[in-house]
Amino acid sequence: MKRFVTFCTCSYLIIAVFWGSLAFATTDMVAEASKRSTNTQQVELGAYLARIGNCMGCHTAKGGQPFAGGRRLVTSFGVFVTSNITPDKNTGIGLWSEEDFWQTLHHGKSRDGRLLYPVFPYTEYTKVTRQDANAIFAYLQSLPPISQSNPASDIAFPYNSQILLALWRTLFFKEGVYEPDLSKSETWNRGAYLAQGLGHCNACHTTRNVLGASQDDTLTGGEIGGMNWYAPSLSSRLEAGLSDWPIDEIVALLKTGVTERSMTLGPMGAVVRQSLQYLSEKDAHAMAIYLKSLSDNDSKISSGVNFSVMTGSLRRYLDFGGQLYEKHCQTCHGTDGKGAPGIYPALAGNRSVTMKSPLNTIRTVLHGGYPPTTQGNPRPYGMPPFQQILRNEEVALIVSYIRNTWGNRASLVTAVDVERSQGGTH
């Protein structure tokens, strides 16, 4: 009997240990599954945010491996080569920690403490929250590692000095996560956070001083150095301000690159194709709310031709332009300049044609262009290049004509303007 009791006691003990171990194992499995689920959610969020930040757009060479860097960015201060941000341990960021990544994104410093140049827009990315930064890092660490060493940047003297860069940062860089405007709605603040931070709109749509620093943060427009394109003001209805646009049309422009009265070309077309088309409906709506709210700044008014005092030579100048327009442009854009909505953009009343800088219009005539291929506009109509057909003088005549016909009023364009527009990114 004693042996039986001992046997039963041992059996109960074994069963208790077994069930206890099973309970611990189950708890561990649940915890591990929960961790995997959390990690998956973080990576998915990071993938979305990396797209909104257009990380791949810069950190991928033309025809190269995604995120492996090697793209050359030509600026007034030298040629910068983007870095490999895949998790390769030798040539990428495989040995980086979350803290290292945060230091780069928020403080503009590399893992080794080296100061980074603002061609990497940490001046805007500093507004990104730590939670979002960690999510982007988790996504980048989930990518396949690519072993790719990239050439060093070729920065002109004296801009290659870390001491001078430190001085530049003291004068022009203010770090800090986005602070919500409590007088605005949650939706407005979300749009502002995306546009000012990850979207880094101000990196292009701003006027810069001789040291390359943004002169304001109100998206008043400016020429994009090294690209030879003009990023129009987003706060002026004379350029690309959206204060009088319906929200749905702004959303359509962000996500498809095309509306009945407008389309994106050049660098902005690439941003829509690579980044903005992937905005969630909620975030696109929020960004539209923010962009629509920007105050009007109509200081960049182009001086048009005064037809009441126009000389015979000026009249002949525009008449010659009209003849060239009829021959090369009228088939698509029409005699009335109204084009075909959503297909061939209207030139009559088109702000991109009449804004102070004629640069984008000149480049479009020279090099042609297509709106971005997007989910909402999978087969865009395009315009052929005329650089091989028209002389600079003829391009100037056509652009001057369309800037001063059908009620348009803007300054005339010369062959010198056309010559200066050559080069840069098409």
Sequence positions of predicted segments:
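Positively charged n-region of N-terminal signal peptides that target proteins for export
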Residues: M1-F4
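Mature N-terminal segment immediately following signal peptide/propeptide cleavage
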Residues: N39-T60
